């Protein structure tokens, strides 16, 4: 495991704990990582986690489109959308589906935990917690979709 994976995992966990404690993801965390992901592309020709530049750009767009309906319906906040877009920039589209899946499972586990131990369920849960922990899990376990990129 390289410093890139460890850095992305630490960044994701930092975002998750911030969203859990304060229910907000600051712009310096989300847009800073998105900017870093975009800055790495012309310098190296690939994203920070090694996917081709086309996968990183597609990852940003796919992350935006995946969470846009939930944002419009006020199920997630703008910080969650930017957090997921930064994950697309740092890891490419290959990591997005596994992160999205893990985030859903983690969020459902939080709901089940609250229902089981307190008997109550919040109206809204910080989705950044699931996204951050899911991203760390995916990055550290090297769980990716095997996509073949003609544009590299």
Q: Where is each model-derived feature located?
A:
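A membrane-topology feature that recognizes alpha-helical transmembrane segments
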Residues: 1-152
């Amino acid at each position: 495991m390289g410093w890139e994976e460890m850095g992305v995992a630490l960044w994701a966990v930092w975002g998750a704990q911030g969203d859990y404690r304060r229910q907000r993801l600051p712009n310096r965390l989300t847009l800073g990582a998105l900017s870093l992901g975009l800055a790495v592309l012309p310098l190296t020709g690939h994203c920070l986690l090694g996917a081709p530049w086309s996968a990183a750009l597609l990852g940003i767009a796919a992350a935006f489109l995946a969470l846009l309906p939930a944002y419009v319906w006020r199920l997630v906040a703008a910080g969650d959308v930017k957090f997921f877009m930064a994950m697309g920039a740092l890891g490419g589209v290959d990591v997005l589906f596994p992160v999205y899946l893990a985030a859903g499972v983690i969020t459902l586990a939080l709901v089940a935990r609250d229902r089981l131990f307190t008997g109550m369920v919040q109206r809204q849960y910080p989705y950044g917690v699931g996204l951050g922990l899911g991203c760390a899990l995916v990055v550290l376990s090297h769980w990716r979709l095997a996509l073949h990129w003609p544009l590299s």
